[in-house]
Amino acid sequence: GRGLTQCRSEGPGEIHFITHSLGGILLRYYLSENTISELGRVVMLGPPNQGSEIVDGLLTLPGFGFIGGPAGVALGTGEGSIINSLGPVEFDLGIIAGSTNINPLEFLFITGPSDSIVSIESTKVRGMNAHMVLPVTHTFMMRNNEVIEQAIHYLKTGSFILESIDEEVDD
């Protein structure tokens, strides 16, 4: 509401978004229910676009449903997950995933390389225009100079700076 109103008051033009983690899911949910006619490009940093494998692991612990509540349970990777009910994106989206793990217990919950919180695979979503992997952690990726440079470049051009794209993405 207020943020969009303020953007619109700045004058005509596109409204771009950079989100981090669950912020990307909130934007996807908002756009599934609303239209932003001035929507430009979106860059998501470490979004759990296919749900959270950590939530799946925590669901097995007694009391998680009570502590995490229905919202916590709905963030998993299962069929009942709100995240997985959102479907493909229909806007210009670039995603940056991290590949640096500093979580010694990650192996208990996450399959494959991750940023310590979200697996690289889980960041992907059907309809995305670009995906890249950088050697950053989930918690601090938004403060990383290369992430910032890549995000700004994507908002301006609709593509990431190709020299930095991880080879995993080219498969």
Model-derived features: where do they sit?
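Serine-dependent carboxylesterase/thioesterase catalytic core
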Residues: 1-90, 107-110
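C-terminal catalytic-base region of ester-bond hydrolases, centering on the histidine
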Residues: 88-171
